[in-house]
């Protein structure tokens, strides 16, 4: 008797649950930008190519952030500061990456604003297709990357064009995007390392002076880094190092 009663109660709970689920189903789809998750017949959730496109963009956003924006140069230079000061975990990596991200937003904001107005808004309003959206969205980034390489006379572009066995382009529009990205990454590495040399020089002088003084005093077993660290921090604070580095990084993209 108890088994039959338990079975009846179990079936009743399941029936009630299905009824509640059916009554709580939404009648409208999720409102994502230019993505319709409910088909026109109201038959349930579908996954169109637009959703796949959004997921692809989200997946590739870290690579996009590193390879096509100012993030690479800023992150490397900020890491060089920590190494030049002989600091191991201060500031922590999360803080350095967070500061690099915000500085990237400041330097890239005009470019992102153009992409938003010329590419995203027309696509959201269904005025353009995805092909035109890509062309309009990639154009400001191409201009930004090409402008940053103007100081090196675009040597990196010529290098990767020759590696790819492409003919010499007549103008900027004939440079393939993947060649431009690779050239931009190489250029950013070169610029970041040049800035790193300038950052390291004054602190190397302090290390040499401290090491020479310790040698003259016969204190060979005492690590020079332990003694030079307070002097490095004192120099960095006296010259307002964080402000100088931040302003120098931002101005280097103008």
Regions found by a protein language model. Give the residues of each.
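N-terminal secretory/membrane targeting signals
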Residues: 1-20
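Hydrophobic alpha-helical segments and their helix-loop boundaries in membrane
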Residues: 20-254
């Amino acid at each position: 008797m108890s088994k039959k009663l338990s079975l009846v109660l179990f079936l009743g709970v399941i029936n009630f649950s299905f009824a509640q689920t059916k009554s709580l189903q939404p009648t409208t789809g999720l409102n994502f930008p230019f993505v319709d998750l409910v088909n026109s017949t109201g038959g349930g959730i579908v996954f169109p190519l637009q959703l796949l496109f959004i997921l692809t963009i989200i997946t590739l956003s870290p690579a996009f952030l590193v390879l096509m924006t100012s993030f690479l140069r800023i992150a490397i230079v900020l890491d060089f500061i920590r190494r030049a000061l002989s600091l191991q975990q201060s500031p922590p990596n999360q803080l350095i990456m967070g500061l690099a991200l915000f500085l990237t937003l400041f330097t890239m904001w005009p470019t992102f604003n153009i992409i938003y107005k010329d590419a995203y808004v027309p696509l959201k309003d269904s005025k353009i297709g995805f092909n035109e959206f890509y062309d309009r969205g990639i154009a400001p980034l191409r201009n930004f990357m090409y402008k940053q390489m103007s100081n090196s006379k675009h040597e990196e572009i010529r290098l990767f064009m020759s590696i790819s066995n492409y003919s010499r382009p007549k103008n900027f529009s004939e440079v393939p995007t993947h060649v431009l990205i690779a050239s931009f990454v190489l250029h950013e590495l070169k610029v970041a390392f040049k800035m790193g040399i300038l950052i390291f020089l004054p602190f190397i002088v302090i290390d040499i002076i401290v090491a020479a003084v310790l040698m003259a005093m016969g204190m060979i077993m005492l690590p020079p880094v332990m003694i030079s660290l307070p002097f490095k921090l004192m120099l960095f604070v006296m010259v307002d190092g964080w402000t100088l580095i931040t302003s120098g990084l931002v101005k280097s993209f103008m």
